[in-house]
C-alpha cells in the first residue's frame, strides 16, 4: 500500500449533500484571494470546515436484536420522560426520550437507531430556536419518523436548530431500514430525539459523547435474564 493510499484511507468520504456548499466556499475563496489574500485564507478555512461538516465516515454498528444505537454524532443533552410529537402516533402518555445535540463541528449524517420498517414520516414546520432547549422539541421545525420492529415502535425526530435551516430525509414510508443505516442529514447544528417504549432504560448518561450508529443508547431486551451483553 502506497503512502497516498494510506492517507486516502484516513480521510472520511464527503456526503453528496455537501458538494454544492463545498464548491461554493471554494469558489468564494478563489475570488477572495484575487481581491485580498487574507480574505482568501479565511475562505479556505471555511471551505475545509464545510468539508469536515459533511464528512460521512464508515461506522461499525453492533448487530443484535433490540439494541438502540445513537442516530447522531454529538452529546447526550437530555434523558427524560416526554410526550412524543402527535404526528408520530405513539400515544398520549410520556415515553423515555434520549436527545443528542449536534454542534457545528459534529458529523451531521443521521443513522437509524434500530433495524425495522419506516412506518411513518411526518414533517412539521416551526421555529429555529436553540436546539439544546427542551422547548425546541415542540416549537422547532422537525421531521419525525416511526420505525417499527417485530416487538416495538421507535420514534426518531430530526429537529432544526438555531443555525440549522434544512432537514433532509433520504428514506420513504414502507421502506425497510437497517440499524446504523443513513436516513437523513441536518445542515449546520441541530438535535435528534429518540422515543423509546415505556420501561426502557437508558444505557448512556447526560453529557456523554455519542457516535452515530455505534453508541448504544438502550437495549429493548435488557430485562431478559439470558441477555449476556452489557454496554459500557
From Swiss-Prot:
Its main location: membrane. The keyword Heme does not apply. The keyword Ribosomal protein does not apply. It holds the Pfam family PS_Dcarbxylase. InterPro entries: PS_Dcarbxylase (IPR003817), PSD-A (IPR033175). It catalyses: a 1,2-diacyl-sn-glycero-3-phospho-L-serine + H(+) = a 1,2-diacyl-sn-glycero-3-phosphoethanolamine + CO2. It is a peripheral membrane protein. Binds 1 pyruvoyl group covalently per subunit. Its EC number is 4.1.1.65. Pathway: Phospholipid metabolism; phosphatidylethanolamine biosynthesis; phosphatidylethanolamine from CDP-diacylglycerol: step 2/2. GO terms for biological process: phosphatidylethanolamine biosynthetic process. Belongs to the phosphatidylserine decarboxylase family. PSD-A subfamily. HAMAP family: PS_decarb_PSD_A. Catalyzes the formation of phosphatidylethanolamine (PtdEtn) from phosphatidylserine (PtdSer). This is Phosphatidylserine decarboxylase proenzyme. The lineage of its organism: Bacteria, Pseudomonadati, Pseudomonadota, Alphaproteobacteria, Hyphomicrobiales.
Amino acid at each position: 500500500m502506497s503512502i497516498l493510499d494510506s492517507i486516502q484511507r484516513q480521510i472520511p468520504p464527503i456526503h453528496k449533500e455537501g458538494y454544492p456548499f463545498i464548491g461554493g466556499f471554494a469558489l468564494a475563496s478563489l475570488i477572495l484571494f484575487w481581491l485580498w489574500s487574507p480574505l482568501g485564507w479565511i475562505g479556505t478555512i471555511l471551505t475545509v470546515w464545510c468539508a469536515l461538516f459533511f464528512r460521512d465516515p464508515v461506522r461499525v454498528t453492533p448487530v443484535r436484536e433490540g439494541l438502540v444505537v445513537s442516530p447522531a454524532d454529538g452529546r447526550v443533552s437530555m434523558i427524560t420522560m416526554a410526550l412524543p410529537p402527535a404526528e408520530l402516533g405513539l400515544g398520549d402518555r410520556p415515553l423515555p426520550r434520549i436527545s443528542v445535540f449536534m454542534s457545528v463541528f459534529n458529523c451531521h449524517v443521521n443513522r437509524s437507531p434500530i433495524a425495522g420498517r419506516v412506518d411513518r414520516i411526518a414533517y412539521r414546520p416551526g421555529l429555529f430556536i436553540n436546539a439544546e432547549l427542551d422547548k425546541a422539541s415542540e416549537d422547532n421545525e422537525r421531521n419525525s419518523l416511526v420505525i417499527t420492529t417485530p416487538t416495538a415502535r421507535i420514534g426518531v425526530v430530526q429537529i432544526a436548530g438555531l443555525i440549522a435551516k434544512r432537514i433532509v430525509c433520504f428514506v420513504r414510508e414502507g421502506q425497510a431500514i437497517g440499524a446504523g443505516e443513513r436516513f437523513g442529514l441536518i445542515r449546520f447544528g441541530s438535535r435528534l430525539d429518540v422515543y423509546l417504549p415505556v420501561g426502557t432504560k437508558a444505557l448512556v448518561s447526560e453529557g456523554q459523547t455519542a457516535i452515530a450508529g455505534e453508541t448504544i443508547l438502550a437495549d429493548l431486551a435488557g430485562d431478559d435474564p439470558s441477555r449476556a451483553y452489557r454496554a459500557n
